[in-house]
């Protein structure tokens, strides 16, 4: 689960992290008042969307101006004017894709004098199953670019859960970033605060880009991106309240309500599969035979007839989908349940596109019998390869 920058900063401030004074507005008429509550003389006006690259992004609408989603203002009135230009407009960045995202919130904060920009992140290292620090002197840049071009400029190390965070972890970060004197002490304290927040709130990633040294020589969190483990949000009512459903794909949101693992993609063949590994293999083989998957959808091992029906509705709600491939290997999942769900869904949505079904495993004969006796135009497949070839042929012709 992702949250906005202003929410991330407010959360980190609760743990003592140094952030700029800021206000969030949803109406243009509130922007001047919000800006006037801060000292100035420089204000930063930031579009709030769940995507990176806002500063380098462009708005679709001409009246939003040529600048990106992060703008500087030298008066409260100018800050209000910039907020008005961006609110309700569509911002396109390298992470949003060409469709972009509508800006419904603007964050106005005090500007900061910047001496140095650095990169810092905490994340779950799946290889070591530990929380890891990642830092670099190359702040304000895309860290993937830094990793590709100058990997030696990135330091990464994990924290042993037996000891937890210790001051030497903070010193290691500080020295790698070239900090000195009081900045080292500030870094040790800040890293501890961030580590505590990460652990207590079940975060998956905490990215600060940039972490800066101000012109007064102090550390400050200038930008923050936080994502939480969706499986742990139930433990944190305060975190759950931060969810902005308008930033989420409606199909992914609907899927989450039925415990379906769904990710929208850009292809034309909808996929419904049980098991993440088989789902990825299904997407791969569709690409192998010359088409593109429209989604990743894992119905899981305990899917009911109702859940399968909802999965079908979600797939068919995507206007890009030109055909559907149902690929089920029934272990825990029974093939007859899948078959009943498929038939019910086809009848309910009035399916008008090719449908290929491959069933194997528990109650497979019952499943095939249900489909064969349904009277529906369903293309049966014997195996994964056969199914992929048939759906690609049906869609491509």
Curated annotation (Swiss-Prot):
Substrate binds at residues 274, 331-333. It is an enzyme of class 6 (ligase). Residues 9-254 form the ATP-grasp domain. It holds the Pfam family ATP-grasp_2. Mg(2+) binds at residues 209, 223. Keywords: ATP-binding, Ligase, Magnesium, Metal-binding, Nucleotide-binding, Tricarboxylic acid cycle. Binds 1 Mg(2+) ion per subunit. Its cofactor is Mg(2+). Succinyl-CoA synthetase functions in the citric acid cycle (TCA), coupling the hydrolysis of succinyl-CoA to the synthesis of either ATP or GTP and thus represents the only step of substrate-level phosphorylation in the TCA. The beta subunit provides nucleotide specificity of the enzyme and binds the substrate succinate, while the binding sites for coenzyme A and phosphate are found in the alpha subunit. HAMAP family: Succ_CoA_beta. Heterotetramer of two alpha and two beta subunits. Belongs to the succinate/malate CoA ligase beta subunit family. This is Succinate--CoA ligase [ADP-forming] subunit beta. The gene is sucC.
């Amino acid at each position: 689960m992702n949250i906005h920058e202003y929410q991330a900063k407010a959360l980190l401030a609760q743990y003592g992290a140094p952030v700029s004074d800021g206000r969030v507005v949803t109406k243009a008429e509130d922007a001047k008042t919000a800006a006037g509550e801060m000292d100035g003389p420089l204000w930063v006006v930031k579009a709030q969307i769940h995507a990176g690259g806002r500063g380098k992004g462009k708005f679709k609408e001409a009246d939003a101006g040529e600048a990106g989603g992060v703008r500087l203002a030298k008066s409260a009135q100018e800050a209000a004017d910039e907020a008005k230009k961006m609110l309700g407009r569509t911002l396109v960045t390298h992470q949003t894709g060409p469709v972009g995202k509508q800006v419904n919130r603007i964050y106005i904060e005090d500007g900061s004098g910047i001496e140095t920009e650095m990169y810092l992140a905490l994340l779950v290292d799946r290889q070591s199953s530990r929380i890891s620090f990642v830092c670099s002197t190359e702040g304000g840049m895309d860290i993937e670019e830094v990793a590709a071009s100058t990997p030696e400029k990135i330091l990464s190390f994990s924290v042993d859960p037996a000891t937890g965070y210790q001051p030497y972890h903070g010193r290691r970060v500080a020295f790698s970033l070239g900090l000195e004197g009081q900045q080292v002490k500030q870094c040790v304290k800040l890293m501890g605060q961030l580590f505590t927040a990460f652990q207590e709130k079940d975060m998956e990633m905490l990215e600060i880009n940039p972490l800066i040294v101000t012109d007064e020589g102090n550390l400050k969190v200038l930008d923050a991106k936080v994502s939480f483990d969706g499986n742990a949000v139930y433990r944190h009512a305060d975190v759950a309240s931060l969810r902005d459903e308008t930033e989420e794909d409606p199909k992914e949101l609907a899927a989450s309500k039925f415990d379906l693992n769904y990710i929208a993609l850009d292809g034309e063949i909808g996929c419904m599969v049980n098991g993440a590994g088989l789902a990825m293999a299904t997407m791969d083989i569709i690409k192998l035979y010359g088409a593109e998957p429209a989604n990743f959808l894992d119905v899981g091992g305990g899917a009911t007839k109702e859940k399968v029906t909802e999965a079908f509705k979600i797939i068919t709600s995507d206007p890009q989908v030109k055909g559907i491939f149902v690929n089920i290997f029934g272990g825990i999942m029974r093939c007859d349940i899948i078959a009943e769900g498929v038939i019910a869904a086809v009848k309910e949505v009035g399916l008008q596109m090719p449908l290929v079904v491959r069933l194997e495993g528990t109650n497979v004969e019952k499943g095939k019998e249900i489909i064969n006796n349904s009277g529906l135009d369903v293309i049966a497949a014997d195996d994964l390869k056969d199914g992929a070839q048939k759906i690609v042929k049906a869609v491509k012709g």
